[in-house]
Amino acid sequence: WTIGHVHSGALGWVGMVSFGAIYFLAPRMWARERLYSLRLVSVHFWLATVGIVLYAAAMWVSGIMQGLMWRAYDALGFLEYSFAETVEAMHPFYVIRALGGVLYVLGGLVMAWNVYKTARGDLRDERPYETSSAAPAAAPAE
């Protein structure tokens, strides 16, 4: 539980704020009009978001499970689960954590590529995101 909590704050909150600051500062540091690619910013955001959700959620669930296993006693007052059984039960969650970490790091690599191309002065020919052709929102409530 604690590991999931700390990593959701450190990677989720601090990491995302840091990424936003880098994206804001990169074009200004190298006197560029804009970032190389806003689409890559979106790719990075979704890779990092899905990665941190998998990472933190897996650690939250496995931490609670570990705590429940450590406080389970048999009729004689001995621990019901050995340490090895606890570690074995947590293994699938470590696999999910690793997958989340890989996605988060891949997002960071996408950001590094985008910042590198921005520093070089390259511009990507991108069409802007299309806006929805849906009807406008109803009038605000009074």
Where are these regions (language model features)?
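Hydrophobic cores of alpha-helical transmembrane segments in multi-pass integral membrane proteins
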Residues: T2-E33, S37-T86, P92-L123
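Short, highly charged, low-complexity non-transmembrane loops/tails of multi-pass membrane proteins
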Residues: L123-A141
